[in-house]
Amino acid sequence: MSFERPQDPSSALEQATQDVSNLKSESRFLLEEIRASDLEFYESKKRFLNKDTQIHKFIKQHGSLVDNPKEAEFQERIKEDLERCHQLQVDKCTVANSLLYMVTKHLKKVQANIEALEEDGLLAPLEDDAVELANELSRESSVLSSGTSLERRKRTVAAGTLSAGSSLRKRVKKERGRSTQRDGMLSEPPSDEASSHGANFADDLQDFNDELFSLNQQEEDDKQLYCFCQSVSYGEMVACDGPNCKYEWFHYGCVNLDEPPKGQWYCPECRQEMANLKLKKKKRV
């Protein structure tokens, strides 16, 4: 594609504004795809964690020697959800890479126009910070365009996005005060449609955050420590019937059990506490 040199800065600005006129809607569409994938990902993750929790609860209640009639079905569903989560992550990388490529393409064109105007003496050279930013964006676009395979792009997009994004945010704050007039020319008042979309997005985001909090809470519960050894739940475990037991569940090996106890069972500490109470009652009598 041939490069048409701009005649003056105003024509370059007008061309750049025209080129990015659809960028907002295109970016929103891609970001909504990523968000939809995130929601589906956390739903799948919640499902397989729930199935895994049910399997472990059955083992706690009946021991590992008793067959769980639903374990095979649960394991198959867990496998399906894990595979779906993996595919969703791959799809998100592809969409994010498309968005990065789309933005970088416009930035490269703006940079080329600026360099052409500087060469023709129609534009003063950029300040040091702006030059560094332009060079950094150029390096990112080179990395993106040099990759010929999707896997290679996926490996570079994460680091590139973080690097360019963090530098851009820092420097835009510095330049914002200098470009008030230019921003006023390009900005548009928000439309009713945009406001409605923002309100719907805020509601959906709140629902998503609530689901994420619930999922994190469930994960924290799975990390609870039990037994004298203060470890997470694993293998065969037995529950103490002591009403005030501070450990609640015990691993068989830690309390010298080989099979589920018959009737009520108390841990050594609770048995000692019960014995002390009986001794105190006898002394009072």
UniProtKB/Swiss-Prot annotation:
PROSITE patterns: ZF_PHD_1, ZF_PHD_2. It holds the Pfam family ING. A zinc finger (PHD-type) spans 224-273. Zn(2+) 2 binds at residues 240, 245, 267, 270. The record marks 226, 237, 241, 249 as: Histone H3K4me3 binding. Keywords: Cell cycle, Chromatin regulator, Coiled coil, DNA damage, DNA repair, Meiosis, Metal-binding, Nucleus, Zinc, Zinc-finger. Residues 10-36 form a coiled coil. One of its GO terms (biological process) is meiotic cell cycle. GO terms for cellular component: cytosol; NuA4 histone acetyltransferase complex; nucleosome; nucleus; piccolo histone acetyltransferase complex. Residues 8-24 have a biased composition (Polar residues). The keyword Membrane does not apply. Zn(2+) 1 binds at residues 227, 229, 251, 254. It comes from the Eukaryota. It is found in: Nucleus. Residues 1-24, 155-201 are annotated as: Disordered. Component of the NuA4 histone acetyltransferase complex which is involved in transcriptional activation of selected genes principally by acetylation of nucleosomal histone H4 and H2A. The NuA4 complex is also involved in DNA repair. Involved in cell cycle progression and meiosis. Interacts with H3K4me3 and to a lesser extent with H3K4me2. Component of the NuA4 histone acetyltransferase complex. The PHD-type zinc finger mediates the binding to H3K4me3. Belongs to the ING family. This is Chromatin modification-related protein YNG2.
